[in-house]
Amino acid sequence: MSTIMKHTVGFIASIVLTLLAVYVTLYTSLTFHAKLTIIFGFAFIQAGLQLLMFMHLTEGKDGRLQTFKVIFALVITLCFVVGTYWVMQGGHSSHL
């Protein structure tokens, strides 16, 4: 796929995901938690789309290495977030 085609497809997909998030927020009667979950899902999909379509993550000689670095960074970030939440919940429950 050519670069112009990749950028066009990525741009249109980003707009569609954004409009879907706006639609879910404004025009559905879902609960706040459901809306938030859907919006975060769209956000993660759009972030992956940005990395693949615009940042050319998998292209070139170092494509696999770059992909591994991004996955490693996401795992470390997830460990920090989940670990912090776990410690904060544990500290909160021991003081009650």
UniProtKB/Swiss-Prot annotation:
**The protein's role, per its UniProt record:** Catalyzes quinol oxidation with the concomitant reduction of oxygen to water.
On whether Iron is a keyword of this UniProt record, the answer is no
- Reply yes or no: does the keyword Cytoplasm apply: no
Membrane topology, as annotated, equals:
Multi-pass membrane protein
PANTHER family xref list = CYTOCHROME BO(3) UBIQUINOL OXIDASE SUBUNIT 4
Record-listed E.C. numbers: 1.10.3.-
The record's annotation in InterPro entries points to: Cyt_c_oxidase_su4_prok, Cytochrome_c_oxidase_bac_sub4, QoxD
Sequence intervals crossing the membrane: 8-28, 36-56, 68-88
Give the source lineage, highest ranks first: Bacteria, Bacillati, Bacillota, Bacilli, Bacillales
Q: Name one GO cellular component term.
A: cytochrome o ubiquinol oxidase complex
* Protein's name in the database: Probable quinol oxidase subunit 4
Q: Where in the cell is it found?
A: Cell membrane
User: Pfam families from the entry?
Assistant: COX4_pro (PF03626)
Instruction: List keywords of the entry alphabetically.
Output: Cell membrane, Membrane, Oxidoreductase, Transmembrane, Transmembrane helix
Family membership = Belongs to the cytochrome c oxidase bacterial subunit 4 family.
The GO molecular function terms of this record are:
cytochrome bo3 ubiquinol oxidase activity; oxidoreductase activity, acting on diphenols and related substances as donors, oxygen as acceptor; proton transmembrane transporter activity
Catalytic activity as recorded in UniProt: 2 a quinol + O2 = 2 a quinone + 2 H2O
Any one of the GO BP annotations = aerobic electron transport chain
Q: What class of enzyme is it?
A: oxidoreductase
Family matches, as NCBIfam families? QoxD
